[in-house]
Structure formats: structure tokens, C-alpha cells
Amino acid sequence: METYETSIGTQSYPPTLFPPPLGTGGFTTSGYIHALVDSTSNSNSNSNTNSNTNSNTNSNSDTKIPIVQISDDSHITHDSFKPYMEYHDASHLRNRNISKADQVESTEVMEQFTQWSNYKMRSRSPTINAKPIRHTSQRRTDFTSKNELSKFSKNHNFIFHKGFLKRQHSIRREDRQAKVRSRFRSKKELTSVLNYIELEQMDIANVLASQPVNLHAIRNLTSRDPAVTPIPFLRSQMYATSSRPPYLRNRSISRKLPKSQPGSLPTTMPATATKTIKQNSTTPTTRSVYNKNVGRSNTSPSVLYHPKRRGKLNTKSHARKEQLLLELWREYLMLVITQRTQLRLTLLCSPGSASNESSVCSSNASDLDMSLLSTPSSLFQMAGETKSNPIIIPDSQDDSILSSDPF
């Protein structure tokens, strides 16, 4: 233990710990800190301790941890802090050099395989103090009158005024989170362009990017409040429109046509079905409470791109898929057990074995193999056995295959 003299008395601390700061542990706040790094004073202060303490302090003196002495001498100046500050700066510089050396080694390794320096230079952000790029102002107002347009349209001439169809790349638009570069900023600009276009004489090949055109047909309605609802009496291509307002419609998320059995759908729609449809459309149903909260359908992009949210909405379908995976895994394990049992029976009934029943096994080997492959569960139900007490085929004493496991 190391001793420290104060204005109050002598206090001892462990050799590996520094004394408490000023204002704590009975010290006065008017004290000053002396950093004494001399190793001789360290050895002299430890001469009166026991042998166990000497061994600890000698090992501690090798590391040259500075001793902090607190006193109330008013003549001490800030120059006494220099040894301690020099020690602190030296340790800080040493740690920085070590981390810098590790960084250089990792950079050299990256340079062996990639152009890491070039990539790092490109990824650096531009300087903050750089001045923004200035552009000349562009006029975007269309001053063309209708008389002028009608005059030039007779001769199929066009008027391109200053600033026609030009986009100004401003700094504010570049800093937006959603960079949507619209062709026209206002309805007036779109109208001024459409005045020069004749939609009746326009060739559709100039508008479409590719030759084939995809036309999507409605098969499954999955929106929350669909305006078109399927009727089970009609065919899959025919749908009936709903005349009820949105708050009176059924709020089921998934709306699919039921699977029709062959021969169940008639060729023509019966008269009873038309009557029921008319009655349902004329007689209003009981008004349900309208939910003002905005809900998302099952086909919204947020549901499709976030599996966690999709699992919350479709808990039943997730449980059904999980049950299907468990059934497939169980069937796979049963098939593996069956094949290993079949291999063992084939080796036991091989012609090289010395058992007396080799001829019987070889005659019935094909039938047994087919039964095992076709019905795996029948393996544990032969001779009145159950799954808890399966059949175990013991090894013969004269058999060349020595194994204690049944499979």
C-alpha cells in the first residue's frame, strides 16, 4: 500500500489506484497536484511495507506509474504539472502511432486486391466552404397568344419561345430526398405543349417504347373496398359492379372466386340468380360503422417489401405455410429412415450371408422393397407394432456385418 500525506492526516491507497480527486475523501479544495515520476522515490516509499506488498510495488515501479501527491503549499506553480503532462502526451502519441500503423497495414492489404485509395477519394464529400454553382436565369413563361397559335397551326409551323421545354437544375431540387424530375412543373406548361400536338394524327409507335403491349386482366380482387365484386353464379371472366357506397361494402381483404367443380356451373345464368342480384342491389343492408383510420390493402408496396408486416396481416397463411413445411420435413425424414431400413434388409438377405432364411429373404426382397417405398408409415405397423415400439431387426451371429444400431 502507498501512503500519501495530506493536511488532515496520512491515508493509504492500493498501489494500482490513484487517490480520490480534490474535494473528496477528506482533502481540502485548496490543494495542488504534484506529478513525481522519479522511480527512486517510489522505491523509498515502499521500503517499510511487507514482502507481499514489496513484490506488488516492484512490479508496479517497472511500469512507472506517476505518484500523485496532494499538499496545501501555496508557493507551487503550474510548472509542477509538466512531468505528468509530458507522460500523458507521450502515451497518447504512442497509442496514436499504433492505431495509425494498423490502419496503414489494412490499407496496404486492400490495395493488393482493389483500388481502395481511388474509391476512398471519390467517396469523400465536397468541401463545405465551396461556393454554390450559379446558373443564368431561364424564363419559363409562355407569352404566345391563341391568335398566333392558330395562325401558325394552319401552315403546320411551330413557335419555340425562349425557355421552351427547359428544366432548371437548382440546388434545392438536388437536395430533395425523393428526386422526382417531372417534365412539367405546372398545368399551364403541360397545356402549352399540348397545343402543339395533334393526338388524332399521332402515331402510337412513336410513343410506345416496345412493340408488345401487356394488357392485364382482373383475376383476383384483393383491395379493401373494391368497386367490382365477383359473383359465384357467374363464370370467372364475368363480374358484377356494386352500386353500394364504399362504407356499405364488405370489408374482407382477400376476395377470390371459389374453386368451381367440373360440370357444376350452368351454361346460362338461371332466372333465380338474377332476381337475387336485383333484390340485393335494391334493398339496402344494415349500415356498418365506418372506420376513419386509413388501412392498407394486402397488395400495397409496404406489405410486399416488408415480410414482418406481411406476416402480421396474414397470420393464418403464415401458419398454414409453416405447417406445410413441417409436413414436408416429416415426410423427408420418414423416407430417409425407410431407405436405410431397406438397405439393411437387402444386406441381411444378400447371397453371401450364412443365415438359414437367406432364400426366403431373397425371394421376398422385391415385394418388401416396394412396400417400404410406397408406404413409409407401414414400417412401424407390421405385426401389430406401433410407433412407440418399433420393430428392431437384430444382427445374426454369423453375419459379416457387425453393428448394434437397428438403422
Swiss-Prot record:
Coiled coil: none annotated. GO terms for biological process: axial cellular bud site selection; establishment of protein localization; mitotic nuclear division. Its main location: other. It is found in: Bud neck; Cytoplasm, Cell cortex. Induction: Expression is regulated by the ACE2 and SWI5 transcription factors. Present with 504 molecules/cell in log phase SD medium. May be involved in a mitotic signaling network. Binds sumoylated proteins and may stabilize SUMO chains. This is Protein NIS1. It comes from Saccharomyces cerevisiae (strain ATCC 204508 / S288c) (Baker's yeast).
